[in-house]
């Protein structure tokens, strides 16, 4: 009979983070929600596409709301109480993602729009003809 060995596995200790930063990138095609700590280390991320929406339903405000709720609930295990929100992009899921983070139970301290605005830099792409 083979001798069985017992291997002890150390349990990973979750650190306690009281406040963090929620980066919301809202493009016209998708919404990406990333929650980090103050140093910028990513704790959890979720997108509209990863939440089960495909095609044109990814860019709806409801899809952004579901993605933000999913990310917010996943980070509750770290003991996070307050969030600073940084919004990037012109997409339709901007406000609904912030509202859903507030509904999860976070105290939102700041809302900062970090969308890059050109001071007459590169020429924009041509207009769509549908």
Swiss-Prot record:
> Keyword set for this entry?
Ribonucleoprotein, Ribosomal protein, RNA-binding, rRNA-binding
Q: Which Pfam families match?
A: Ribosomal_S11
Q: Does the keyword DNA-binding apply?
A: no
Known function = Located on the platform of the 30S subunit, it bridges several disparate RNA helices of the 16S rRNA. Forms part of the Shine-Dalgarno cleft in the 70S ribosome.
For this record, the Gene Ontology CC terms, alphabetical, are: ribonucleoprotein complex; ribosome
This chain belongs to the protein called Small ribosomal subunit protein uS11
User: GO biological process annotations for this chain's record?
Assistant: translation
The text of the family note is:
Belongs to the universal ribosomal protein uS11 family.
Q: Which GO terms describe its molecular function?
A: rRNA binding; structural constituent of ribosome
Q: How does it assemble?
A: Part of the 30S ribosomal subunit. Interacts with proteins S7 and S18. Binds to IF-3.
């Amino acid at each position: 009979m083979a001798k069985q060995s017992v291997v002890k596995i150390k349990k990973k200790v979750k650190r306690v983070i009281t406040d963090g930063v929620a980066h919301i990138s809202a493009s016209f095609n998708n919404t990406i929600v990333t929650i980090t700590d103050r140093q910028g280390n990513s704790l959890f991320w979720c997108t509209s596409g990863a939440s089960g929406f495909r095609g044109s339903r990814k860019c709806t405000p409801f899809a952004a709301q579901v993605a933000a709720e999913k990310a917010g609930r996943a980070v509750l295990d770290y003991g996070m109480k307050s969030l600073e929100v940084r919004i990037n992009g012109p997409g339709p899921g901007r406000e609904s993602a912030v509202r859903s983070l507030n509904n999860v139970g976070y105290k939102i301290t700041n809302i900062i729009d970090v969308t890059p605005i050109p001071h007459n830099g590169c020429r924009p792409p041509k207009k769509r003809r549908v």
